[in-house]
């Protein structure tokens, strides 16, 4: 499978500078967008200096990598922008997909209107980053997001034209996975600015391979190579340095660990702007390679339900499962499965601070997203070839065998515990999602 999806912008992105203002126009692309709305947002940023610094930091994340070659690093990738429901969100991944970043401009962070809502892709090359870096504290800056234009208005001159860029396949996979990890995470720590600065000063130099742990010593947080009972495990702790330039500007830092420590989310607050950074468990294991979404993709969801979500939802809208159940006549007990399924398909993002999903339609066909899970495809192939046999089944235990290559694997499901005799399960112990044999057995049980 190709590692990138190449697409054609209808027009280039550019920064148009005149004597009295600057206008930033960002192009967009979508395989699925129904309405060609010319503008998603137009208005004035109330704190453009903070917004500009957050977007520059997000760009640094997008241009970073913690396990790729110099050749791969030369390929710039583009953030995704969602505007609607009185919020503007910019999000992106590092090249290796082990770091996910998002900038949320919330109500009060702008003075403007949302003529329509939607999701678009924009390219942040160096000229654009330089323009964002040049925003001063007292400047009046106008912003618009749409099909043909996003405008930053300030003093200056000249024009910057951006090129189209390919969007990596693993970005799409990462977007579907990171939301499920964030949804399972809960806030554990809230630090003020001084505590946040103290914490980041304890990040070891270099690129430590060993795990570090966020521990509290009295009122002072720090990173330690030794874990304690209530500590938070962070692999690849040096990745947090990406958000270090924002610390002196932030008022608060909140930490949201995954219950199994498979990810951590770090959120900085600047009044009406929020910057989020999520780290995968290890540098070499990005969100795109995780199996968190696989369980949600086992059970098929009728196309009419997906169409129903698309019908009443709009960009950044809070996803209300109860409303979906009521309006479409779906049994309430199935709504949780539908929510997880929609998140796994990229239709939902997650706001850890407000503890809810929000609708965000990725600009790609659902069939493409669903085709990006090789383990699930392998499980379906095992079923098609008749290689799955259920030996016994009771209320709390299932035993099955799955024919492999020159070997037969045994699968045991006992309550929430599941085991398989294959090498994948032996190596990962379920930390990276179920193996194809367990997926095949589960899919057969519900078919």
Predicted segments, located by residue:
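Long, low-complexity, compositionally biased intrinsically disordered regions
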Residues: 1-447
């Amino acid at each position: 499978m190709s590692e990138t999806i190449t697409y054609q912008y209808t027009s280039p992105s550019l920064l148009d500078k005149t004597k009295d203002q600057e206008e930033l126009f960002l192009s967009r692309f979508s395989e699925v967008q129904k309405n060609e709305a010319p503008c998603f947002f137009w208005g004035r940023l109330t704190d453009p200096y903070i917004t500009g610094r957050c977007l520059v930091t997000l760009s640094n994340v997008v241009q970073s990598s913690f396990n790729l070659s110099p050749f791969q690093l030369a390929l710039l990738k583009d953030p995704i922008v969602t505007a609607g429901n009185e919020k503007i969100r910019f999000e992106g991944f590092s090249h290796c997909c082990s770091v996910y970043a998002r900038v949320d401009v919330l109500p009060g962070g702008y003075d403007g209107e949302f003529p329509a809502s939607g999701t678009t892709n924009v390219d942040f090359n160096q000229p654009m980053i330089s323009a964002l870096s040049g925003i001063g504290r007292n400047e009046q800056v106008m912003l618009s997001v749409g099909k043909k234009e996003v405008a930053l208005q300030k003093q200056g001159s000249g024009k910057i034209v951006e090129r189209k860029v390919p969007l990596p396949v693993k970005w799409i996979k990462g977007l579907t996975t990171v939301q499920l990890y964030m949804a399972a995470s809960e806030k554990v720590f809230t630090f003020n600015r001084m505590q946040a600065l103290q914490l980041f000063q304890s990040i070891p130099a270099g690129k430590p391979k060993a795990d570090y742990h966020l521990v509290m010593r009295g009122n002072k947080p720090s990173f330690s190579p030794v874990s304690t009972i209530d500590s938070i495990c962070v692999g690849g702790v040096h990745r947090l340095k990406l958000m270090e330039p924002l610390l002196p500007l932030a008022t608060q830092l909140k930490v949201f660990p995954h219950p199994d420590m498979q990810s951590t989310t770090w959120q900085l607050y600047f009044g009406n702007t929020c910057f989020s950074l999520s780290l995968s468990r290890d540098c070499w294991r990005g969100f795109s390679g995780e199996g968190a979404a696989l369980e949600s993709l086992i059970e098929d969801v009728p196309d009419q339900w997906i169409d129903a979500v698309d019908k009443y939802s709009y960009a950044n809208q809070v996803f209300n499962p109860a409303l979906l159940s009521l309006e479409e006549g779906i049994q309430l007990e199935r709504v949780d499965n539908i929510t997880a399924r929609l998140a796994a398909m990229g239709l939902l993002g997650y706001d850890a601070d407000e503890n809810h999903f929000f609708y965000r339609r990725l600009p790609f066909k659902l069939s493409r997203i669903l085709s990006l899970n090789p383990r699930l495809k392998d499980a379906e192939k095992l079923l098609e070839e008749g290689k799955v046999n259920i030996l016994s089944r009771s209320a709390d235990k299932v035993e099955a065998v799955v024919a492999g290559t020159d070997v037969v694997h045994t699968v045991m499901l006992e309550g929430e515990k599941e085991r398989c005799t294959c090498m994948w399960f032996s190596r990962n112990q379920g930390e990276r999602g179920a193996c194809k044999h367990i997926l095949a057995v589960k899919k057969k049980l519900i078919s």
